[in-house]
Structures are given as structure tokens and as C-alpha cells.
């Protein structure tokens, strides 16, 4: 196994594939053929050919997996291993503009019952505050959700809003401010007391936080989690840390196959949607909402099929 390429698909940090592009993704798995642009140099494309044996795991990121649930039986039947990161937050359509929260709790529970609590990670991410969403609001809603999700997940990932430069205007329009250390301390202290009372443990992890949360038993998170992937696969294996992620990130190496500016949720805090929206998706194309320009693109083929 030493030196063999590891293929973990991240689907995706850049868009919500389960909510909007499940048909495209399922078709790519059927064909064993998928491509992604380099986000730094958009003219560089990596084109993967693979079979289930070549893919260690698929990490799904979503705010609404309901449209994708019908795909899971076929994905299981093909032999792919996967887990979900499911963001459930208490914001209204002022912040998360196109998310219907009416059945979100039921969807979380149904997905957990389908795949298991160990393969469903709850993300309360990010925590943002303004006059409508003060710290007390977050404490109440987090604790209520934690009680409802108890037994249906084993882990919750939290993060606090980062002031990306290109988000400054959106943050000002909604009077969003970064949390002070005292506000973070207040939030963490109260939610940890609730978690300690739950009959089934939910472990807290934090994503690349500057504030030290170790006093609250908060672990450094790995969204693309090598230890979890090894457990799901039933193997003893160490995965390499991803050098392309932010300092403090615990993720192992993966290939993100999403495309920026394709998510339709239109969350005001999102770092992945800062250009003209691409919504047309061709299931015959290995690229999401995109096609290969045979004149200007450089394509690197990576063939990981058995016997290739």
C-alpha cells in the first residue's frame, strides 16, 4: 500500500452536492469518471477514472440531504464508503436565504437511522451574532437541537464567524460582528453544561479556531477525518495530513470535486459563492456545472481502476 494514491472525494466544501446535484454525482459514480478544476489555476483539470475499490471514502457536506436520500441504496450497492457532515443552524431566511428548515430535524433523524450516528456529523457552523441572533438565542437553540439529536450523532462541529474580506459588506448589512472572547466563553460554558446532561455523548470539535477551547473539552476538528475513515473501512491505516488547508486544520488529503458559485442556498456568510452563479448541470460532463475547454484547458488523467 505504501506509495499508492489515496482517493478521498470531498463532496464538497465548495457547494452542496447532495441538495442540488445528487443526480450528476450518482451518474459520475456509475461511470467511474469525474473531474475537478484547480481552484488556484482554473485552466488545470484533474480527471479521475476509478472504481469503488480505488475510493477510500466520500465525505458529503450538506444543509439538506433530503433530495439525495434516494441515491444511497445504489451508492451502497456499488460498494462506496461515505459519511455526512450536515449543517443545521437556527438562522432564518435573512441569513440562509434558500433553506427550508421545516423538516430539517426530521431529515437529520431519518439520515441517522439510515446510515448510523457514527457516520453523521452535526455542524453548528458558523456561530454569528447580531441583534436578532444574540448569544442567548444560540445557547437556547443549540441546547434544544442537542437534545433532539441525542443518540442520532456522536459529534458536533462548531465554528465562529471569520471575517473574510469579501464578506465585509454582507456582514455590515446584517450587523454581524465577530464574537469576543467573553461571548465565546459564555456560549461554550452553557452548551457544555447541557451536553454533559445528555444520555448519549455528543463530542464537541472546533474548526480552525483561534480561541483555545481545550478547557471545554473541545477537540481540534478534522472534517476529512482519517481516523473515522479508517473505522468506516474497518482497516488500520494512517492518512496524510492535507498541506493545502489552513493552519490548525486536522483534515487528511482529499480531492474536492465541487465548483464554486454553484450553491443555491445563498447564505450570507458563505465563502464559496462570490461570483456569477452557475446553475446548469450536464450529467454527461465529468465537471460539475462545467465542461472541458479542449483548446485552453490542460487535463491530467489519473486512472486508479484495478488493472489500469
Describe each PLM feature range.
Residues 14-16, 63-65, 87-91, 125-127, ...:
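Active-site beta-loop-alpha junctions enriched in small/polar residues
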Amino acid at each position: 500500500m505504501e506509495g499508492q494514491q489515496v482517493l478521498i472525494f470531498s463532496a464538497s466544501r465548495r457547494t452542496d452536492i447532495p441538495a442540488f446535484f445528487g443526480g450528476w454525482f450518482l451518474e459520475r459514480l456509475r461511470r467511474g469518471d469525474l473531474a475537478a478544476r484547480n481552484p488556484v489555476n482554473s485552466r488545470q483539470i484533474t480527471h479521475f477514472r476509478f472504481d469503488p475499490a480505488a475510493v477510500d471514502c466520500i465525505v458529503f457536506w450538506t444543509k439538506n440531504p433530503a433530495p439525495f436520500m434516494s441515491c444511497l441504496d445504489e451508492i451502497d450497492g456499488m460498494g462506496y464508503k461515505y459519511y455526512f457532515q450536515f449543517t443545521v443552524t437556527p438562522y432564518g431566511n435573512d441569513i440562509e436565504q434558500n433553506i427550508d428548515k421545516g423538516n430539517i430535524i426530521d431529515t437529520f433523524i431519518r439520515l441517522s437511522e439510515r446510515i448510523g450516528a457514527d457516520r453523521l456529523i452535526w455542524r453548528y457552523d458558523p456561530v454569528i451574532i447580531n441583534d436578532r441572533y444574540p448569544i442567548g438565542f444560540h445557547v437556547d437553540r443549540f441546547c434544544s437541537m442537542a437534545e433532539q439529536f441525542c443518540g442520532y450523532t456522536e459529534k458536533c462541529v462548531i465554528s465562529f464567524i471569520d471575517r473574510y474580506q469579501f464578506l465585509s459588506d454582507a456582514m455590515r448589512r446584517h450587523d454581524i460582528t465577530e464574537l469576543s472572547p467573553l461571548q465565546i466563553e459564555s456560549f461554550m460554558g452553557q452548551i457544555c453544561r447541557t451536553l454533559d446532561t445528555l444520555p448519549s455523548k455528543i463530542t464537541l470539535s472546533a474548526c480552525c479556531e483561534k480561541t483555545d477551547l481545550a478547557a471545554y473539552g473541545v477537540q481540534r476538528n478534522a472534517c476529512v477525518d482519517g481516523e473515522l475513515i479508517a473505522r468506516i473501512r474497518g482497516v488500520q491505516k494512517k492518512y496524510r495530513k492535507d498541506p493545502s488547508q489552513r493552519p490548525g486544520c486536522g483534515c487528511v488529503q482529499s480531492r474536492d470535486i465541487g465548483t464554486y458559485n454553484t450553491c443555491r442556498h445563498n447564505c450570507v456568510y458563505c465563502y464559496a459563492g462570490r461570483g456569477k452563479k452557475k446553475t446548469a448541470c450536464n450529467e454527461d460532463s465529468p465537471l460539475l456545472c462545467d465542461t472541458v475547454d479542449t483548446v485552453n484547458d490542460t487535463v491530467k488523467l489519473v486512472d486508479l481502476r484495478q488493472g489500469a
